[in-house]
């Protein structure tokens, strides 16, 4: 009997149990013509279930031992890439056609991976959706609405580019070894932003700046960013039609877009 792979703490590995891998494949709803990229296949619980149902499956795994273990039983339509997904050329892959994303993300790098996917979508397109397993608290931040404690930079920047829906919630026992937290599977359906932005980088910079002071009034939270661009925060807020006594966490994406345009 082949030994089960050992999860490595330094990679934040928690391997999905077979019954939950079946549920995740059902939630993904793969089609025979689909091309997929899987982030962190681990020992292949999802890989080996998904591959027979799709045209191509590219996997990116940082752990060389897991890649070696998968090589012996991966189907011919699976491409195994040893490396860090944060360094992977996703734009090169989508040149051949759309690529759906799936992955059980390590908790310690889930946010950088989310921002990489957003950046790749912005630059190259070709990513219809991403079905991602995340720590439940991270999922809650992405789903959060204006005025709630979880609403912030991650909520705004992810939902600027994608519709978000929750597919599954998983207990710690869905993984081996069991983490100390619950997990959730979100589906991100990538699309153009629902607002018009002349300078998206300035928008992102403003959002990050004002949310470092999310409990201050907008008049004060906006001031450092506005002054750095030669603009008065009170004038910009008035021009955008936003009450300067509100707090950053109460603004929706449309209000933030208007404000960014006035400052820029």
Per-range role (PLM):
Residues 1-209, 238, 249, 258-261:
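Catalytic cores of RNA-modifying enzymes
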Residues 190, 207-264:
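C-terminal lobe and adjacent flexible extensions of AdoMet/dcAdoMet transferase-like proteins
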């Amino acid at each position: 009997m082949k030994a089960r792979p050992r999860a490595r703490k330094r990679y934040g590995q928690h391997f999905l149990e077979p019954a939950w891998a079946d549920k995740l494949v059902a939630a993904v709803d793969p089609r025979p013509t689909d091309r997929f990229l899987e982030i962190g296949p681990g020992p292949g619980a999802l890989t080996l279930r998904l591959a027979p149902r799709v045209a191509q499956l590219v996997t990116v795994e940082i752990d060389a031992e897991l890649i070696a273990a998968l090589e012996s039983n991966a189907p011919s339509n699976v491409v195994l890439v040893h490396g860090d997904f944060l360094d992977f050329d996703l734009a090169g892959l989508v040149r051949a056609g759309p690529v759906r994303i799936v992955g059980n993300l390590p908790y310690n790098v889930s946010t950088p991976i989310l921002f990489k996917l957003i950046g790749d979508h912005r630059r190259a397109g070709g990513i219809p959706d991403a079905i991602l397993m995340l720590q439940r608290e991270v999922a809650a931040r992405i789903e959060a609405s204006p005025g709630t404690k979880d609403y912030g930079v991650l909520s705004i920047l992810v939902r600027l580019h994608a519709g978000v829906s929750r597919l599954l919630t998983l207990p710690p026992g869905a993984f081996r070894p069991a983490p100390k937290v619950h997990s959730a599977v979100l589906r991100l359906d990538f699309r153009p932003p629902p607002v018009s932005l002349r300078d998206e980088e300035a928008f992102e910079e403003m959002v990050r700046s004002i949310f470092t002071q999310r409990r201050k009034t907008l008049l004060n939270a906006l001031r450092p960013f506005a002054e750095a661009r030669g603009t008065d925060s009170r004038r910009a807020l008035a021009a955008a039609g936003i009450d300067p006594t509100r707090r950053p966490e109460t603004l929706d994406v449309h209000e933030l877009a208007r404000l960014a345009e006035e400052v820029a």
